[in-house]
UniProtKB/Swiss-Prot annotation:
Record gene name: PCMP-H41
NCBIfam families xrefs: PPR
Region Type E motif: start-end pairs: 585-660
Pfam families per UniProt: DYW_deaminase, E_motif, PPR, PPR_2
InterPro entries linked to this entry: DYW_dom (IPR032867), E_motif (IPR046848), Pentatricopeptide_rpt (IPR002885), PPR_At4g14850-like_plant (IPR046960), TPR-like_helical_dom_sf (IPR011990)
Designated name of the protein: Pentatricopeptide repeat-containing protein At2g22070
Keyword line: Repeat
Family stated for the protein in its record: Belongs to the PPR family. PCMP-H subfamily.
PROSITE patterns the UniProt entry points to: PPR
One GO process term, biological-process aspect: RNA modification
GO MF annotation list: RNA binding; zinc ion binding
Length: 786
């Protein structure tokens, strides 16, 4: 038998190179590379830079950065490709520290080197660094390629920073790359993510060549801004559609509440295309079934998933659990969790299951499921906390959060947002600050949902400055909730003009308000007495933003007219409402009648309110107070007697203050506090001092026919005054006092607290049922209009 003829070095070199090039993107690439590597060493082919570069490239693309680096170090000669290959290997594994270190060693940096750095930072979510690297690249005189620009635009889209995006766009025009399809598609996506549909359309209309991605981007954009008809029109124009096209249509209709249309598009996809639904398709159609409570269709989709062998995990599992939980199939949802575990379970899926049991009135079963879980991850903990928070069990939520953190579980943005909501509901600044600290430690402080919750928490706890800081923290990532939360916060704290300026800025930024935003806008107009602006915004809401007014909007407008003394206009507004006024609407009118002493209209408002809620103590009290304020003591007594006969209990006024993490509650003439003697003595001293300063007790605020001396004593012992006295003796000088009250602050307390703030040299913040009052140096932020 003849011996094999040995291969020449040139033939062996060619063979090894071909093997490597064919294996670059294959699963066995690393194995092939190792075989070739051994052959290279045995045959002494280390001299071939071309072969070594190919070998390094395989190691790099298969994730073996250390192998690539070792080979690089052994090479006698290196090219720019050699350096960039190792750089890419480090970047692909997400090791940007090593990538930066190696980048600094490069003898010469070309566009590939810089782009590798940009891609690396983008892939690990450090978008701002990716953008900065491109800036450095341009300063070095290196011209970006289309691949550089598409990755930079993706980073800009992720940060949603429009100003940066426009600068990159201008640079693209200068480079003459706006005709490139990939770059134009990236521009489309960037403008869509940044919320500028006009610029996105501008780019699309000027594209000479469009591919499926171009059309998909415009469909997604139309869906994002609620232009479903335009999205449908572009969908119909497309000669070719991919799975992204169908998903954009289905998810767009689903997210906008057009769930039947989403299911219709899904049916059309199955009927007219050869494409199979992917996990995003299935998640959207299951969500549509959940919203429509179509259990039958949901079961059919579940059956399709099982029969086609589709993997039930991730978003599909969550969508199935949500669908069954919301459609009355809670037990099926529970069995799915038992079978699949909670590894892939998202907060929405687990919360849907909890809500399913809670809707059945079975919170214990929800708790039992939680307790039975062997491996409780952050999702399980968060779902239970959210469940407690949504159902007002704040103590349980706090205790569970402490157990979670104490057990070493790190909270996520959902956990922190829920706990901040708990702190908001309790108006507890100390709890809120603790959660804020947890957000900083966990790195979730830059999450939009956490920042939005921080804005609300600080606002409700009386710290508008910290609320503004939280708002500023997410300058490039604000959503409608962010703007709305800050507008409402400013309105509640008496900064009405700032609230309206912020609203106008929001519009200029290209964001459209929702129905809650307008509640904040009307509230700002109400607190500042801006009647004409309120009318204009009401018309704008209907005509420009096409928002159908709800009872909340109508009640706000009645409150606006009523506080301004336009009682006749308020009444006419109610009469023209296309929907039946509710308790809040009539209550706003009744409250205005009490302030402006209009007995006749007040009686009408009270009667209509009591027809809706016969046991509403507030209506009886407001009418009795109206009679008392007008000197009609007998009529007031009759109202109080009818309350007694009807066993309607008047809501008692309380004020509370948090000192050293403990809440102290006070009622009128409260004698239950352990430090009552010192509190009463302090209040007596303050009373005498502010009278010397010019304070005159408003005995008309005591709505009982009593002696003036008795009235004055009652005024001195109102709950908010006692809370202030306790705060003064329990906190260091210059400490801001924050008082919460469950009823409206009376005229006398409002006047007295202005004098007290000047006397003691402190800011006193009082939150009542209508707004925050910031008392400082003898003045109040409400300007005596509340």
């Amino acid at each position: 038998m003849d011996a094999p003829v040995p291969l020449s070095l040139s033939t062996l070199l060619e063979l090894c190179t071909n093997l490597l090039q064919k294996s670059v993107n294959k699963s066995n690439g690393r194995f092939t590379a190792q075989l070739v590597h051994c052959r290279v060493i045995k045959s002494g082919l280390m001299f071939s830079v071309y072969l070594m570069n190919n070998l390094m490239n395989v190691y790099s693309k298969t994730g073996y950065a250390l192998h690539a680096r070792k080979l690089f170090d052994e090479m006698p000669l290196r090219t720019a490709f050699s350096w960039n290959t190792v750089l890419s290997a480090y970047s692909k594994r997400g090791d940007m520290d090593s990538t930066c270190e190696f980048f600094d060693q490069l003898p010469q940096r070309d566009s590939v080197s810089w782009t590798t750095m940009i891609v690396g930072y983008k892939n690990i979510g450090q978008y701002h660094k990716a953008i900065r690297v491109m800036g450095d690249m341009v300063k070095e005189g290196i011209e970006p390629t289309q691949f550089t620009l598409t990755n930079v635009l993706a980073s800009v889209a992720a940060t949603r920073c429009m100003e940066t995006g426009k600068k990159v766009h201008s640079f693209i025009v200068k480079l003459g790359l706006r005709g490139n399809v990939s770059v134009s598609n990236s521009l489309l996506n960037m403008y869509a993510k940044c919320g500028d549909p006009m610029m996105a359309k501008f780019v699309f209309d000027r594209m000479v060549v469009r591919d499926i991605s171009s059309w998909n981007a415009m469909i997604a954009l139309h869906m994002q801004v609620g232009q479903m008809d335009l999205a449908m029109a572009q969908f119909e124009q497309m000669a070719e559609r991919d799975i992204v096209t169908w998903n954009s249509m289905i998810s767009g209709f689903n997210q906008r509440g057009y769930d039947l249309r989403a299911l219709d598009i899904f049916s059309k996809m199955l009927r007219d295309s050869l494409l199979s639904p992917d996990r995003f398709t299935l998640a959207s159609v299951l969500s549509a079934c959940a919203n429509l409570e179509k259990l039958c269709i949901g079961k059919q989709i579940h059956s399709h998933i099982v029969t086609t062998g589709f993997d039930i995990s991730g978003i599909v599992l969550n969508a199935l659990i949500s669908m069954y939980s919301r459609c009355g199939g809670v037990e099926t949802a529970r069995r799915l969790i038992e079978q699949r575990g909670t590894k892939d379970l998202k907060i929405e899926g687990f919360t849907a299951l909890l809500d399913g049991y809670i809707k059945l009135g079975d919170m214990n079963q929800a708790k039992n499921i939680f307790v039975s879980l062997k491996d409780r991850d952050v999702v399980a903990w968060t779902a239970m906390i959210v469940g407690y928070e949504q159902h007002g069990s704040y103590g349980e939520a706090i205790n569970l959060f402490r157990s979670m953190v104490g057990g070493g579980q790190r909270p996520n943005s959902y956990t922190l947002a829920a706990m901040l909501s708990v702190a908001s509901s309790l108006a507890s600044l100390s709890h809120g600050k603790q959660i804020h600290g947890s957000a900083v430690k966990s790195g979730e402080i830059y999450s939009v949902s956490v920042s939005n919750a921080l804005i609300t928490m600080y606002a409700k706890a009386g710290n508008i400055t910290s609320a503004s800081r939280a708002f500023d923290l997410i300058r490039c990532e604000r959503d409608t909730v962010s703007w709305t939360s800050m507008i409402i916060a400013l309105a509640q704290h008496g900064h009405a003009e700032e609230a309206l300026e912020l609203f106008e800025t929001m519009l200029m930024e290209g964001l459209r308000p929702d129905h809650i935003t307008y509640v904040g806008v009307f509230s700002a107009c109400t607190h500042a007495g801006l009647v004409n602006q309120g009318r204009q915004y009401f018309d704008m809401m209907k005509d420009v933003d096409k928002i159908i007014p709800t009872l909340s909007h109508y009640a706000c407008m009645v409150d606006l007219f009523g506080r301004a003394g336009l009682l006749q206009e308020a009444q006419e507004f109610i009469e023209k409402m296309p929907i039946e006024p509710d308790v809040v609407t009539w209550g706003s009118l009744l409250s205005a009648c009490r302030v402006h002493k209009n007995i006749d209209l007040g009686k009408v408002a009270a009667e209509r309110l009591l027809l809706l809620e016969p046991e509403n103590s507030g209506a009886y009290s407001a009418l009795a107070n109206l009679y008392s304020a007008c000197g009609k003591w007998e009529e007031a007594a009759k109202i109080r007697k009818s309350m007694k006969d009807g066993r309607v209990k008047k809501e008692q006024g309380f004020s509370w203050i948090e000192v050293k993490h403990k809440v102290h509650v006070f009622g009128v003439e409260d004698g239950t506090h352990p430090e009552k003697n010192e509190i009463y003595m302090t209040m007596k001293k303050i009373w005498d001092e502010i009278k010397k300063m010019g304070y005159v007790p408003d005995t008309a605020s005591v709505l009982h026919d009593l002696e003036e001396e008795v009235k004055e004593q009652i005024l001195r012992h109102h709950s908010e005054k006692l809370a202030i006295a306790f705060g003064l003796i329990s906190t260091p000088d210059k400490t801001t006092l924050r008082i919460m009250k469950n009823l409206r602050v009376c005229n006398d307390c409002h006047t007295a607290i202005k004098f007290i703030s000047k006397l003691v040299g402190r800011e006193i913040i009082v939150r009542d049922t209508t707004r925050f009052h910031h008392f400082k140096d003898g003045f109040c932020s409400c300007r005596d209009y509340w």
